[in-house]
């Protein structure tokens, strides 16, 4: 994995190199092996920090020109089908100097131009400069695994565009201003993350997944276009038997894993107690690898520890498994961890994911993960909530309101499976329409709570993704929306930032676009049937995995944050959440009330207090 950056515009060569060097220095963790800058005549420059994965030779460094010297590439990611593309390009007369997928990518661009994107299987964010036509292209992979930020330049009669893999790099450019977006802040308070459509600083943009940006230096205009549509697959349902679908799923996942185990450095996999990572590891085991190395961590708090199941899976599959219980010095770790994120972020699973990456990096440079399985096959409990929501609509609204009031008498629990929290969240959602209810399942501060906290709060900007699949089954709608929001802006951001903080490349076989398309096209009953989730994934791996794993419901990879906030994290959290930095915006008495309720076990405010804590720590690093 790597960091890419570039400046396109009429600046002096010296200025370009100085500014770009500063941007790259802020992203060294993404590519610690080498740093290079390529001057694009007097039109700008490309930069690259390299984490060597395939072809470790110096000749494979970037930025890289194609053989004709017309196109220059700066590339972050992996092209898993580069070998078959290379064979095709050789037949068309292309010559190669390296064994890297980067060279295959730039030669593919030289041959097919923008149409080459549709031939790629992989995760990527890359930039191409066309020397002849003075055009810049920025491209991001279909599912949004790799990040890319950009901003227009309009300063001192200079027009142009600057881009970088991470916002922490982009803001090192002196003409990029750090003006906080209140709509992005509002979205963060609601969901623990900012959206693709609205970066935390005004004037900075995130290139959406499955899109490319075309910038014309002659006109100083750019446009962003989509090159792949996930919604089309949800509309194009397959007429296929369950047995045939099971066989096809096994084939596609095997193909994906086979493409992703290629590396010239040590490779392993994350292994939790769930079926997703177990399925990936089972295919690695069948790939005839000499040895499969897997890694897990757990907490001392019993309900947050899945190590016994991961160890059972590892023993069943015969892999070399390493696991440990972690005792994180959370008050010292969290500020450093939050600073590794470009924007405010408060998913509590960031802590165990960070610790897992730290553990795995001691042994490998590349790790496969099971991320994406829940979105593809309906693994989240929120989809069961969607089903029950349909039933609840048959009850009078007065009955639903009464049930919500009664739920506040439930005793508060700080366990991982905190049913009192889930029941209260569900009953509030039962009063809403389906779209609003599905969104509310993951809300941290609902509108009423946000109003008490932030009297001058503003509505956040959110695209209504439901409209793309309005005529599909309601559970298909929910899964599509989650892939366009939760997966892109929470799960994949978390995995990218914490893995890159350790210079570890994480690959996600479930997000191979061919597998994603197939999952979207299959009947919803193959994914969720009655109270069973991931039906087809469980059936397709019944021969390979232990029964305990096949029966295991979704638990998640969360932290005991509610417990920590009442104990070892309290001092730091209270100081940060009641600091002037936050109380300038927010009502301090509302924050004090949340602390009183939480500390006295009157209400589990763990997620809301952690949201404010992470925001405050982010402000200390970036404002």
Report the location of each language-model feature.
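Generic hydrophobic alpha-helical membrane-span motif
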Residues: 37, 147-150, 279-282, 376, ...
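Short low-complexity, flexible loop/linker segments enriched in glycine and/or proline
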Residues: 336-340, 383-385, 564-566
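Active-site adenylate/phosphate-handling loop in enzymes that bind or generate adenylated species
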Residues: 142, 355-414, 486, 491, ...
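Adenosyl-5′-phosphate
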Residues: 1-4, 22, 172, 202-208, ...
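Flexible, active-site-proximal loop/turn residues at the rims of small-molecule/cofactor binding pockets
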Residues: 11, 373, 619
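Short, basic, helix/turn surface patches
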Residues: 123, 127, 346-357, 396-403, ...
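Short beta-alpha connecting loops at secondary-structure transitions
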Residues: 170, 296-297, 343, 387-395
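Cysteine-centered catalytic environments shared across enzyme families
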Residues: 1-341, 353, 357, 543, ...
